[in-house]
């Protein structure tokens, strides 16, 4: 079939504070890490040997996924870091450099490899992508999606000849300057020989360094225009929007956990909710061991994680409460992501608990 490579060593700075204590692939959607959906998708398509490069907060990825047997796959990890004055510090080697490190260590990439970023949700037909890659005799392929011209400035744009051979790239061009509307999705198919072009023991990037080499040497390097759901979580605003879509049921293969107690309202085990004294309008998920007090209002799409406490008269509108978040009496949160330590609005503006610059108050339900 093929092997898999999940790129998971980045710091995730654009989605802070969500990644303050988590690697980006561990950011949750419906209570599951982003990367879990990727592994499940790879397994469904028969890709069972998967390497993951890790750096920041790497233990959280490794402890959660282990050897991959829970998903019917084999997972391996390649840590990227340095020893600095007695401390081991994360130091990513770049997307291509990280793959070359694995190849130098074991020669793992001995057949076609599907390369994925660990921070996106996809439903790509992997079998069809592999077939096209192989039928063209490609050394490397980039999976692309057609995007509206007025959105090209948000993407890396791929410029091809008529038969799909890649001629050049444009990084986030203005609409009037864009030579195509084919956006790179960060999904690649590589033959082992591609990694021979990557220098050993150097920081090296796939998009900005490896791909220009392939173009300059006129190697068999193709774009595939495919039609599939690709949900990239590059910013906090993307994360909020994705959760809204998922809760509304607009994303395939994303099943709401818990028991549906009334249309559009799902609850976990051991919840304390006086249904005749609260207002809850779905779609809403309320996690296990959560308490909702009389007079509280929750308007969906909303996700209330496990162990939360929404106090009397509080209002939560189109928001996400991470686990163990407490919302005080009569406090109002609208289109926010709230954890016990911080809250962030849909545009990424962040407040930390205890700051005096806002009227908003919240806390840790365990305290």
Explain the meaning of each model-derived region.
Residues 216-301:
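Extended, small-residue-rich solenoid/repeat segments and analogous flexible loops
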Residues 112-114, 121, 127-134, 147-150, ...:
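Catalytic-core segments of class I nucleotidyltransferases/pyrophosphorylases
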Residues 259, 265, 270-278, 284, ...:
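A structural motif detector for beta-strand N-caps
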Residues 1-63, 73:
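N-terminal glycine-rich phosphate-binding loop and ensuing alpha1 helix
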Residues 62, 70-161:
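Conserved beta-loop-beta/alpha segment of the NTase-like Rossmann-fold superfamily
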Residues 14, 60-63, 101, 125, ...:
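Phosphate- and divalent-cation-binding pockets in alpha/beta enzyme and binding domains
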Residues 341-367:
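Long terminal segments
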């Amino acid at each position: 079939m093929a092997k898999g490579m999940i790129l998971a060593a980045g710091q995730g700075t654009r989605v802070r504070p969500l990644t303050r204590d988590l690697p980006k692939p561990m950011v949750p959607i419906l209570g599951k890490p982003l990367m879990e959906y990727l592994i499940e998708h790879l397994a469904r398509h028969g890709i069972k040997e998967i390497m993951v490069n890790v750096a920041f907060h790497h233990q959280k990825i490794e402890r959660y996924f282990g050897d991959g047997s829970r998903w019917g796959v084999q997972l391996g990890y390649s840590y990227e870091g340095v020893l600095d004055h007695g401390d081991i510090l994360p130091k990513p080697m770049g997307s291509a450099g990280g793959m070359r490190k694995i190849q130098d260590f074991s020669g793992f990439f001995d057949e076609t490899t599907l390369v994925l970023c660990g921070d996106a949700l996809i439903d790509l037909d992997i079998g069809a992508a592999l077939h096209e890659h192989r039928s063209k005799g490609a050394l490397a392929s980039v999976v692309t999606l057609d995007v509206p011209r007025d959105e090209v400035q948000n993407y890396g744009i791929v410029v091809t000849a008529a038969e799909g051979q890649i001629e050049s790239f444009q990084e986030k061009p203005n609409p009037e300057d864009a030579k195509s509307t084919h956006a790179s999705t960060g999904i690649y198919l590589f033959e082992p020989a591609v990694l021979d072009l990557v220098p050993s023991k150097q920081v090296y990037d796939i998009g900005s360094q490896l791909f220009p080499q392939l173009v300059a040497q006129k190697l068999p390097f193709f774009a595939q225009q495919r039609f599939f759901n690709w949900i990239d979580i590059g910013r906090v605003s993307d994360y909020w929007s994705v959760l809204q879509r998922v809760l509304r049921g607009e994303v395939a293969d994303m099943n709401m956990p818990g028991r549906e107690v009334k249309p559009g309202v799902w609850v976990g085990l051991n919840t304390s909710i006086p249904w005749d004294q609260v207002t809850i309008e779905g779609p809403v998920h309320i996690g296990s061991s959560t308490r909702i007090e009389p007079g509280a209002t929750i308007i969906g799409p909303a996700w209330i994680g496990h162990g939360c406490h929404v106090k009397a008269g509080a209002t939560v509108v189109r928001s996400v409460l991470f686990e163990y978040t407490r919302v005080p009496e009569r406090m109002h949160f609208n289109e926010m992501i709230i954890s016990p330590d911080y809250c962030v609005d849909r545009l990424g503006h962040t407040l930390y608990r205890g700051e005096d610059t806002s009227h908003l108050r919240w806390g840790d339900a365990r305290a």
